Amino acid sequence: MKVPDTRHRHISHLYALCPGAQITKRQTPGLYNAAIKSLDLRGDGTTSWSRAWYMNCRARFYQPEKAYEIFTHLIDLQTFPNMFDAHRAMKKGSDEPLSWQMFQIDGNFGAPAAIAEMLLQSHVRLPDGSYEIELLPALPKVWANGKVTGLRARGGFEIDIEWKGGKLTNATLKSVSGEKAVIRYKEKVVTYPCPTGKSLHLDDELNNHKLTL
């Protein structure tokens, strides 16, 4: 297939991957691998908004180091001192910016969304209608130790996660909908009932030690 411009920043053809959820690793592997190839051909974006979208896609591809590399480019090259996103187009094939630049909010929205995707994903919908909640799917090495609180997952869950040495140590999932919780960490998947207002307290093996208010 001829590709007329392999370096173009637009990736509308990958909408079904991200922010959509029709293309996933386990449900549509053929399309998923094709999406990876397509993004590899495009590089890492040029404008700030495209880098943010690419960063989200790399998180969906389970490529934490690539996602983090794009993030550092956003911060170092395309962010004003006041942390506003700088719509600073780069010269083709390089990280050297063109002379003009302006504020564009897309990067300010897209980069935090990508960080959340690196720590938690819940876009995969299972045949019974429930969502699979995946913990730390794209954690980069530089974030070896940390915690995050208050992330929201599809299916109606509020989630806190802690990790050390690049590995999950514990997680808490609070239900706001009463739906069952389907949780994945790496290759392990568990399912727990979780009534509205209750919280699951999981260890590093996804064992639930208590159900609390």
Predicted regions and their residues:
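Extended glycan-interaction surfaces of carbohydrate-active proteins
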Residues: M1-S48, E69-H87
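A near-ubiquitous, low-amplitude feature marking generic local secondary-structure context
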Residues: K2, K37-S38, S50, S94, ...
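Aromatic- and histidine-enriched alpha-helix N-cap/loop-to-helix transition segments
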Residues: H10-L14, T46-A52, Y62, F103-G110
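Well-ordered alpha-helical scaffold segments within catalytic/enzyme domains
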Residues: Y15-Q27, W53-Y62, A114-R125
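Conserved short loop/turn motifs at secondary-structure junctions
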Residues: R51-R60, A89, S99-Q101
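Non-catalytic C-terminal accessory modules of carbohydrate-active enzymes
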Residues: E65-L213
